[in-house]
A protein has these predicted regions:
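Intrinsically disordered, low-complexity terminal regions
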Residues: 2-348
Length: 348
């Protein structure tokens, strides 16, 4: 009988390492999958809110949008993988969907056993929800490991999500998003906006706070703002902030980061206060050439302050600071760089 084993000295070293990993790892080499589809529907006539709750040991995707009916409709797909199809089906049977009505709120809840047999294993399970609700509802979610894609028109939304990305659009009054390790994208929002995540980015577009305020906070993630009007506070660390086409109105606005850069392109300022803080990073400001504001710029030793395309009447000017007046002092801009960095102010 011929020996079909391959001598190790004929294999590249990297292949030997990979084979060793495959042999030593508890991988499900023969896996079977099972998928089940279902749907549920409940009357939402007279209701004004929707609430979603999912367990910690189940992840997937949620797609929520509005429709013209007076019902809430949920289309549900559950997928599982195990070493046998019978076991995979057993996993899907363990996930229960409950859709009911409690006075003015429609509740959708997914439940699973705890602990579940797929936890800590190489088995897999994933849920996909397609949710349809009436126009101008309020929405509340408490999820983990779900990616959320939510489109209005919705009046108010309150999202709490861990380990998943979030996309929200078309909110008319109030938006509150608390995430962990998830990217957050928000667009077409009116009213107050509060977004907090960590170790990922925040992007907001086409926002008007309507006499309210927007608060954007992350760490180790970039903040992007485009087409904004109102009051804005944005903070991150070790990552840049880029805001363009922004109008700052009646109140305090703050931008903070460290060891990165801040780029602000301001279309208009109306009786607003702008405070920018950075550490060992540059700050670039583009403002209207007819800006009316009091300026105060400070950098650390070795830093630079550059201005162009705008008329400033200086009151203090030295190697590390510039104070001055543009126009009638209707607004205030203060920029402080702790350590070496450059402030550049450009009129357009």
């Amino acid at each position: 009988m011929r020996n079909h084993c391959i001598a190790s000295h004929f294999l590249p070293p990297i292949l030997i390492i990979l084979l060793g990993i495959l042999i030593s790892s508890p991988i499900v080499l023969c896996s079977e999958e099972y998928t089940e589809n279902s749907q549920a529907q409940v009357s939402a006539k007279g209701a004004n809110g929707f609430r979603l709750i999912t367990p910690a040991n189940l992840g997937g995707q949620v797609y929520l949008e509005v429709w013209d009916e007076d019902d809430c409709l949920v289309k549900f797909k559950i997928w599982a993988r195990a070493d046998a199809q019978e076991k995979a089906k057993k996993f899907t049977d363990m996930v229960e969907l409950e859709l009911d009505r409690e006075e003015e709120v429609v509740n959708l809840k997914l439940t699973t056993p705890h602990p579940a047999p797929w936890e800590g294993s190489n088995y897999g399970i994933n849920a996909t929800l397609y949710i349809f609700i009436p126009h101008n509802f309020t929405v509340e979610t408490k999820t983990q490991a779900f990616d959320l894609d939510i489109t209005g028109p919705i009046t108010k939304i309150d999202i709490q999500n861990q380990y998943g990305n979030i996309l929200v659009s078309d909110i008319s009054e109030e938006t509150s998003i608390t995430a962990t390790y998830g990217q957050v994208d928000v667009e077409n929002v009116r009213g107050s906006l509060n977004v907090e995540t960590s170790y990922n980015s925040i992007s907001v577009r086409n926002v008007d706070t309507k006499d309210e305020k927007a608060l954007l906070k992350t760490s180790y993630g970039k903040i992007d703002v485009e087409r904004f009007e109102g009051q804005l506070e944005a903070s991150t660390v070790y990552s840049p902030i880029d805001a363009s086409d922004i109008t700052l109105i009646d109140g305090k606005n703050e931008f903070k980061t460290v060891y990165s850069k801040i780029d602000l392109d301001i279309t208009e300022m109306k009786d607003a206060q702008l405070y920018v803080q950075n550490t060992y990073g540059n700050v670039n400001l583009v403002v209207p050439e007819d800006l009316s504001a009091r300026l105060k710029f400070t950098v650390g030793r070795g830093g630079k302050i550059i201005t162009r395309g705008i008329i400033i009447r200086p009151t203090v000017l030295n190697q590390t600071s510039l104070e001055g007046i543009c126009g009638k002092e209707e607004s205030e801009i203060e920029v402080d760089i702790n350590g070496i960095g450059q402030i550049q102010l450009e009129g357009k």
